[in-house]
Regions:
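Glycine-aromatic-enriched surface loops/turns that form tight recognition elements
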Residues: 1-77, 81-152
């Protein structure tokens, strides 16, 4: 079952943490066949429900793949380290992410847009097998999720 988040507005209500949308931007059930966008209702960010298809990518091509996403109007970019950490769930394993909200994310390395402080040749990422966060050489291979502010 997917997480819930308590949101205080005019009183307190409980709503699902994640919501799913199809390529046209219409709401669908989490995990539906046409679920391609996952909205984090606690942050207002939307993520692609899957990483790029196919082979692993080095950091720069992964960043380019994120900005090339054209689902539901575009406006996509690579996530920051903090944005990837925000969707990581260390109570889960292989993958360490809500698999209902992100049904096509594998338990592998996903790049962030943030470079490490110790070297511009390295960038941060999350290993969704167990939720580890680390820096890796930008020539190493990984996957990418794209992110944007909801409503773009």
């Amino acid at each position: 079952m997917s997480e819930t988040t308590t949101i205080a507005a005019a009183g307190t209500t409980t709503q699902p943490r994640f919501a799913a949308f199809n390529a046209a931007g219409n709401a669908v059930a989490l995990g539906a066949e046409d679920h391609v966008i996952t909205r984090d209702t606690s942050t207002g960010l939307e993520y692609t429900a899957a990483g790029q298809r196919g082979d692993y990518l080095e950091h720069d091509p992964a960043m380019q793949a994120c900005t090339a996403v054209a689902i539901a109007g575009g406006g996509w970019r690579a996530p920051t380290r903090a944005e990837l950490i925000a969707i990581t769930d260390i109570t889960r394993h292989a993958p360490a992410i809500d698999a209902e909200a992100f049904p096509f994310v594998s338990d592998d390395w996903y790049w962030s847009s943030d470079l490490t402080a110790w070297s511009s040749s390295s960038a941060w990422g999350v290993y969704f097998n167990y939720g580890g966060v680390d820096g890796a050489h930008r020539g190493d291979d990984g996957f990418a999720l794209a992110v944007r502010r909801a409503g773009q």
